[in-house]
A protein has these predicted regions:
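Active-site neighborhoods and metal-handling regions in enzymes and metal-associated proteins
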Residues: 2-4, 12-20, 25-29, 44, ...
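Cys/His/Pro-rich metal-binding microdomains
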Residues: 9, 22, 33-40
Length: 403
């Protein structure tokens, strides 16, 4: 009996000779064939979506059989949880960090106020899209109610980051940090802003070593000598976001790593000291660049600080590098973040095929600090400051987590 004609999953042509996808065979996915090796390779990235969907389906079936989905996933064999995701199995990594599988998405109680993207199937913020289309000016927050609402969000964000940093140690997984952030946010009647924002799958960004930003929490355990950035944003019951991040040295970090973290802190501190009415937003990048360069570091150009408040991201756009063309002059009532990402090597970055994790192109380490601030009549107010630290002051002990 001759082989029946089937369609190539790459080009769609009818084929008789069946080149089966080995991963589909492993997962039990039928009738997934290609006409030749070249077609298979050129279409593999898109084809992997089928693998991901099947893996999620299998996981859901396992969870239903166990009667408790989250517990079942957490109790899965360690080797299974730490396996490489499908997209990573043929990916050319730039450094030593590797991703693992992800835990199930955490749920948010119905009573928590949520931003518009929380329920959007693709995580789109329609309010941000309308803002970009219709508004080119920087919003000024004037009323006491608005300002108190933003201050509350920033205070809640600070408390959540403090809780997360207490849990950070050698051997803890970044997924556990995500659990702490998620639960601490809910306890404060806040929504963890990263969750489902353009489909980001977790409640906090955890960026380790060569990861510049947007690292996704997973089952990898934090290692002795890692530097780990925790980026927390919460959305409060008043409808405002508060955003901050800090980088920590975990265990025995070498001199270069500790100096990098301190340099990133100093870059932010120098920029914050310039905040006052009349300062050009573009000038922040100049002082950040000079500080980084003086310490033999570089400044990432792809990602910027941003306006924040009722929207997660809005005007102004604040590049951290010199000779940028940022528009705008600071005025009382402006609320925004500054968040320079500082690298030990070159400034170039690439994004993993998870579509989120930004890493250094040369695999060298990166560090970052971020605050949300309000421009006042005479200067600024650091809304996400540590307790009793209205002005940024370096204290290495604050950013060190021993074994």
């Amino acid at each position: 009996m001759g082989d029946a004609l089937v369609s190539c999953q790459g080009c769609g042509k009818d084929v008789v000779t069946k080149l089966a996808c080995p991963k589909c065979v492993q997962l039990g996915i039928p009738n997934n064939y290609f006409c030749n090796q070249e077609c298979f390779r050129s279409n593999y990235k898109e084809h992997c979506k089928i693998h991901t969907a099947m893996q999620q389906l299998l996981l859901q079936q396992q969870q239903q059989q166990s009667g408790d989905g989250v517990v079942a996933a957490m109790d899965a064999p360690k080797a299974e949880k730490e396996a490489l995701p499908v997209w990573a199995q043929h990916y050319r990594f730039r450094g030593s960090l590797r991703p693992t599988m992800l835990s199930p998405k955490r749920s948010v109680p119905a009573h928590i106020r949520k931003p518009d993207y929380a329920s959007h199937p693709e995580g789109h913020s329609l309010s941000e899209q309308r803002d970009r289309a219709n508004n080119t000016s920087i919003r000024i927050y004037k009323t006491p109610k608005e300002i108190e609402g933003i201050k509350h969000a920033c205070q809640m964000g600070r408390e959540v980051l403090n809780e997360a940093s207490k849990a950070l140690r050698v051997g803890v997984t970044t997924d556990e940090i995500d659990r702490v952030v998620h639960e601490a946010s809910i306890e404060r009647d806040c929504y963890p802003s990263p969750l489902n924002y353009y489909k980001f799958p977790k409640s906090v960004c955890t960026s380790v070593n060569e990861v510049i930003c947007h690292g996704i929490p997973d089952y990898r355990e934090v290692q002795d000598g890692d530097i780990v950035n925790l980026d927390v944003t919460v959305y409060n019951r008043e409808g405002y976001h508060g955003d901050l991040n800090e980088t920590f040295c975990v265990g025995n970090v070498d001199d270069a790593g500790r100096k990098l973290v301190q340099t990133a802190f100093q870059c932010l501190a120098k920029a914050v000291s310039m905040v006052k009415p009349g300062t050009l937003y573009r000038d922040l990048g100049t002082v950040i660049h000079k500080t980084a360069q003086a310490n033999q570091c570089s400044v990432v150009r792809t990602y910027c600080g941003h306006g924040i408040g009722s929207l997660f991201h809005t005007a102004p756009n604040i590049p951290h590098y010199h000779k940028n063309k940022a528009k705008g002059i600071m005025k009382p009532g402006h609320v925004f973040t500054i968040e320079p990402m500082i690298n030990l090597g070159g400034y170039a970055d690439v994004t993993w095929d998870d579509n989120w994790t930004a890493v250094t192109s040369d695999g060298k380490r990166s560090a970052q600090f971020e605050h949300t601030m309000l421009v006042t009549e005479t200067g600024y107010e650091l809304l996400t400051a540590r307790a009793n630290e209205p002005v940024m002051t370096w204290n290495e002990e604050n950013y060190t987590r021993k074994n």
